[in-house]
């Protein structure tokens, strides 16, 4: 197995992450779940994923799921201290360019998680609280964010390569054609739409865009 995705923890966060990957077209055979809970692993197997019963903090367990060849690791345990230990071990064993995406319950632990080697850190409790607050301030804005978070319907945030027909066009040209561009990725650097630092699209550029999932119809 190579360039696969390892999900450590298969509670609500882990299952939601797996669903997002499957909705995006990932092959379920390339998603490996690691959990010390056999029932969670049985559930992952029923979902069509590869499952391994074990403690993600242990080096031998991560080696058993070929972490040295993984493309990305999702750390979705229920406790921040456990997630830090998992992330430390994963970062040491995984390829240098492997992404490690970790969830934290408390936002004050985000810096520790990054120092442990996480590429991206998601503060779950704070994010949920912000969404609830936004829904109170504006029910329409809250509904829109909820829509974006549900990859199976409506609007969806996705990343894709610039097509041949889009080369030499400006982001503004594509916006006029109805494409909503959030960012351009060039040379590994993300340029957000409001910086206006990208004048024309080039070969190798990637775009983060909002698209409409027509499966809703």
Label every model-predicted segment:
Residues 1-217:
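Cytosolic regulatory regions of ion transport systems
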């Amino acid at each position: 197995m190579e360039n696969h995705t390892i999900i450590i923890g298969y509670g609500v966060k882990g299952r939601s992450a797996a669903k997002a990957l499957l909705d995006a077209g990932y092959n379920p055979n390339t998603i490996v779940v690691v959990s010390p809970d056999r029932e969670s692993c049985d559930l992952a197997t029923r979902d069509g994923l590869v499952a391994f019963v074990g403690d993600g903090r242990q080096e031998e367990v991560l080696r058993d799921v070929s972490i040295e060849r993984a493309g990305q690791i999702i750390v979705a345990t229920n406790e921040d201290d456990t997630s830090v230990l998992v992330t430390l071990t994963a970062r040491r064993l995984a390829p240098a360019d492997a992404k490690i995406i970790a969830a934290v319950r408390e936002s004050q632990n985000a810096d520790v998680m990054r120092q442990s080697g996480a590429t991206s850190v998601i503060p779950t409790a704070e994010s949920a609280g912000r969404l609830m607050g936004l829904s109170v301030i504006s029910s329409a804005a809250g509904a829109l964010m909820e829509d974006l978070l549900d990859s199976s319907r409506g609007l969806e945030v996705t990343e894709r390569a610039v097509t041949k027909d889009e080369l030499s066009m400006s982001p503004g040209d594509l916006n006029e054609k109805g494409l909503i561009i959030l960012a351009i990725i060039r040379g590994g650097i993300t340029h957000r739409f409001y910086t206006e630092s990208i004048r024309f699209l080039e070969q190798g550029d990637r775009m983060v865009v909002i698209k409409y999932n027509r499966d809703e119809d």
